[in-house]
Amino acid sequence: MTIGLEPAVSSKTKDKMEQDLSPIADKSCKENRELAKSGKLIEAIENLLITEKQCRQAEDSPSTSKIAAEIIKLCYEAGRLDLVNEKLVLLSKRRGQLRPAIKAIVQESMVYVDQITDMKQKLELIDTLRTISDGKIFVENERARLTKTLSKIKEDEGDIASAAKILQDLQVETYGTMEKREKITFFIDQMRICMNNKDFIRAQLIGNKVNRKTLAEDENQDLKIDYFKQMIRYFSHSANYIEIARCYLSIYDTPSVEKDTPQLLQTLKYICIYVILSASSNEQSDLLNRVYEFKPLTDIQNYKDLLNQFKTLELIRWSTFFELNKPELDSQTVFKTEPNAWEDLRKRVIEHNIRVISTYYQKISTARLAELLDLSLDESEKFVSDLVSNKTIFAKIDRPAGIATFTTTNDPNKVLNAWANNITSLLDLVEKTNHLVQREFMLHKIN
């Protein structure tokens, strides 16, 4: 025989759990607000604390939250910020304090942070709120926002190191209740402050936390632009031009940018500039050909012509190229802020010319090579060596003979295998031809 056992809950405990003390809470708030207005703030707070205890012990979360928030509100409205800090700590540490009540007083106090003009009092309130919210998951979002505010204050004061230290340790990616958009905003701010503090490695690690699929959503277009601007700043530090071009390409593919013609064309200009500044590679060549086919490029014909010069297998004379493009390129930010931009562009022109020469020449004298490149013998040899090291071209330079060779030396085994394959193909063709001739003889009965 099975006997059903029910939890031993006393009627007194059950009644306590089911109590609704909202009428008592409302009445207490109203009466003690009037009492506080008459100048008896301390007495009003004591009365409210008694009511708060009654509601807390009855586990009436809404009423407890309302009373606790009312206490903080009365202290602030009376201009007693010292009492605000004191009662925040008191209420958060009361025995068996309900989570909703702690969350209510933290959220109520956060409203006052923006309203307080005295910086010392503001910092004291932020410090109190961060202390009582430390280690409490149910107010982790509020703590993160307070930390961000504190970091901004330090940044405005010029203390970049402290601002970065405060903000960079936030692990908002683990916050389950924080919205994706707010998380990305935190990541972007963390990246920015880390780069302001010259901590580019940490900025990269934070940037990798951002989910690109979330950025692609329509409601996050502004965040997508802000994020890639920070990534551009990061890659600019190491002059990684191809990655900068890819970042601008991501901005270019944003619907809000596509609708804004001036911004679209300016972004396209940046893409063109950074593509031609990028070192020669398969990725660079692919990107250059893709960008060249963009329809809006016809509205900025000089940039299309610029890409075409690097797309066409013809030599580019640096002096003519420089005079033709200097006025336009000097107006762009990269050539104003990046001291090595023109030198890097000159290197790209030289690399392009070497690739053109390697296409049309199997062998060329080093003197003629230097003449075509407008370089000295040593400079031309260095550039050729760099391209060979990068596996962009194949070349050998015979210094005593003064000859540069751009054709690869075939491996004897590969040559022998190719010859054997060709002979096999030839014999197969002879055999097939013989069969066809014999068939014609038979069809026409020719002996």
From Swiss-Prot:
Residues of the region (Disordered) are: 1-23
Q: Which UniProt keywords apply?
A: Proteasome
To which protein family does this belong? Belongs to the proteasome subunit p55 family.
Name the InterPro entries for this protein: PCI_dom, PSMD12-CSN4-like_N, PSMD12/CSN4, RPN5_C, WH-like_DNA-bd_sf, WH_DNA-bd_sf
Q: Which residues form the PCI domain?
A: 240-411
Q: Does the keyword Zinc-finger apply?
A: no
The family database entries (Gene3D superfamilies) matched by this protein are listed as: Winged helix-like DNA-binding domain superfamily/Winged helix DNA-binding domain (1.10.10.10)
Give a yes or no for keyword Metal-binding in this entry. Answer: no
Source gene?
psmD12
* Free-text function comment from the UniProt entry: Acts as a regulatory subunit of the 26S proteasome which is involved in the ATP-dependent degradation of ubiquitinated proteins.
**Highest taxon of source:** Eukaryota
SMART domains the record matches: PINT
Q: Which GO terms describe its cellular component?
A: cytoplasm; proteasome regulatory particle, lid subcomplex
Q: What is the protein's given name? A: 26S proteasome non-ATPase regulatory subunit 12
